[in-house]
Regions:
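Conserved GNAT-fold acetyl-CoA-binding loop/helix
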Residues: 16-41
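A short helix-loop-beta-strand connector motif used in the catalytic cores of GNAT acetyltransferases and
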Residues: 41-53, 81
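Conserved beta-strand in the GNAT
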Residues: 53, 60-69
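A short, internal acetyl-CoA/4′-phosphopantetheine-binding micro-motif in the GNAT/acyltransferase core
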Residues: 68, 85-92
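Conserved active-site alpha-helix within GNAT-family acetyltransferase domains
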Residues: 98, 110, 122-141
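Glycine-rich acyl-CoA binding loop
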Residues: 54, 93-98
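Conserved acyl-CoA
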Residues: 88, 99-115
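A short beta-loop-alpha structural element at the N-terminal edge
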Residues: 3-17
Length: 155
């Protein structure tokens, strides 16, 4: 049985292993400073970024989810952005991902949010099988401007 619990400082090593797996899956890197800042935010009750770790029967970390809320111009209630979701490859297909999404959905509903949403890569077919069962593909495209490389006034 999978157990979900809010992240605490005691979860650092297990979270870090999952976080690295998540970054590797998406073929990206973050600095150690950013990684530690992220964990500090996730474990600070005063911060508005939330996180949960999933553990298997042996207490091993098998998944993580991070989320935050923000106001919306389209809704009286806030929206909940599920920013990071990762399940260790050995636990995929076992219901861990669905349990993590359901945890966020229940939390968001109890917190007065009007919507939970997230992004994924088009080619992430295994995850999209789950997402298509629990949510609606809105067919919107995602665009972004990286201000570190495209700062205003930069040539």
């Amino acid at each position: 049985m999978t157990t979900l619990s809010p992240l605490t400082a005691d979860d650092h090593d297990d979270w870090l292993s999952l976080w690295w797996g998540y970054l590797e899956f998406y073929e990206t890197e973050l600095t150690t400073a950013q990684t530690e800042l992220t964990f500090a935010r996730l474990t600070d009750p005063a911060d508005a970024v939330y996180g949960v770790i999933a553990r298997d029967d042996d207490g091993q970390g098998v998944g993580l989810v991070h989320w935050l809320t923000h106001p919306s111009t389209w809704s009286a209630g806030p929206y909940c952005y599920l920013e990071d979701l990762f399940v260790h490859r050995d636990a995929r297909g076992s219901g861990v991902g669905a349990a993590l999404i359901e945890h966020v959905r229940v939390w968001a509903a109890a917190s007065g949010c009007d919507k939970v949403y997230w992004l994924t890569q088009r080619g992430n077919e295994k995850a999209r099988e789950l997402y298509d069962r629990v949510a609606t593909d809105t067919d919107f495209m995602h665009y972004e401007i990286d201000l570190a490389t495209n700062a205003p006034g930069a040539a």
